[in-house]
Amino acid sequence: ENACSPTSGFHHAHWEEAHGFCTFNGLMLAAVKVLQAGAKKVAIIDCDVHYGDGTQDIIDRLNLGNDIDHWTLGALPAALQPEFQTVFLKHLNRLDADVVLYQAGADAHEKDPLGGWMSTELMRWRDRALFTVMAAKRIPVCWTLAGGYQQPLRKVLELHSTTMKEALRVERLQAVEV
C-alpha cells in the first residue's frame, strides 16, 4: 500500500552534517529501515529540482549503491529538460524495487524562485506517471511533499494537493480494476 509523509525528505543532509536547510536525511533513514525490514531493493525518486547531494553522500558512505536506486531530477542536464517525459518514463519502466520513496518536489514548478522549469500540467503528469507505473508494477510508494518556495504559500500547497490528488486518483482506478 502507498503512504504519504507530508514532510520534506531532507535530501541535502549528509552523513556527517546538516546541509541546505536539512537537519537529517529522512529519505535515507526510511530507505535503511525498509532494507533492514527485509526489502532487497529500494528506489528513491527525487523530483525536487535540486540535486539530492546528501542522499547520494549517504548511499556512497554506506556502500548501498546496489541496494538503493537513486534517481534525482536535480542531476538531469538542462539539455534533457525538453525530453523529461521520455527520460522519466524510461526510468520508471525499467525500475525494479520492493518500495519507492518519492520526493515530490514543488520547487520544480516554473514559477518557483529557487529553481523550477516544469509547468503545472507537467508536474501533474510527473505524479500521475509515477503512481500509475508503480501501481501497474505493484510497487508501493511512500512520498514526501518537498520543496516549494513560491509566495503566497497557497501556491505551493496547491502543487502538493495535485500530487495527493493524483495518488488518490490512481488508487481509485486500481480499486475499480480489482
Regions found by a protein language model. Give the residues of each.
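A general "terminal functional-core" signal
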Residues: E1-V178
